[in-house]
């Protein structure tokens, strides 16, 4: 297995961060869109246009609650040269595939008092489709205020799992 691609992002605005992300992960983002096109063609009676419409229905809520994330999403789409609709499908795939839903992930913590080294361990597995593995990236983001974030996600998705 290859190492995951690391995307380094440092910009002053969420849109500029998104553009950098989209440009650096363009091929993986486009491959991810194709993974979901094939997946939904096999598992859904809905057309790709209908699936895009479903994903886009989340846009008003995202704009109201997290406008900076939406700004970044537009940047990712522009940087990867894909439509915002395709990017929204990537980011809403959980919601789109929710019913019927099979379990995906397990999260656990081991507290210091339970270990001989008095160390805290955080564990998370990601039980999902093998087809997405080649499109997983590590994001290393440095925000304008100096906040640094490191995380793992499917290319094109806003950060999934991470630390800051």
Task: Give the location of each predicted region.
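N-terminal mature-domain region immediately after signal-peptide cleavage
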Residues: 1-164
């Amino acid at each position: 297995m290859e190492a995951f691609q690391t995307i380094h992002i440092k910009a002053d605005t969420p849109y500029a961060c998104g553009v950098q992300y989209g440009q650096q992960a363009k091929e993986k983002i486009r491959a991810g869109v194709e993974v979901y096109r094939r997946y939904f063609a096999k598992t859904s009676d809905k057309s790709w246009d209908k699936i895009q419409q479903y994903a886009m229905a989340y846009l008003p809520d995202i704009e109201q609650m997290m406008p900076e994330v939406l700004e970044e999403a537009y940047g990712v789409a522009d940087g990867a040269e894909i439509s915002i609709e395709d990017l929204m499908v990537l980011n809403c795939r959980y919601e789109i595939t929710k019913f019927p839903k099979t379990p995906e992930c397990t999260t656990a913590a081991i507290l210091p008092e339970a270990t001989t080294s008095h160390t805290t361990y955080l564990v998370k597995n990601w039980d999902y489709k093998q087809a997405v593995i080649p499109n997983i990236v590590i994001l290393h983001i440095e925000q304008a205020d100096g906040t640094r974030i490191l995380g793992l996600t499917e290319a094109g998705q806003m950060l999934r799992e991470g630390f800051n």
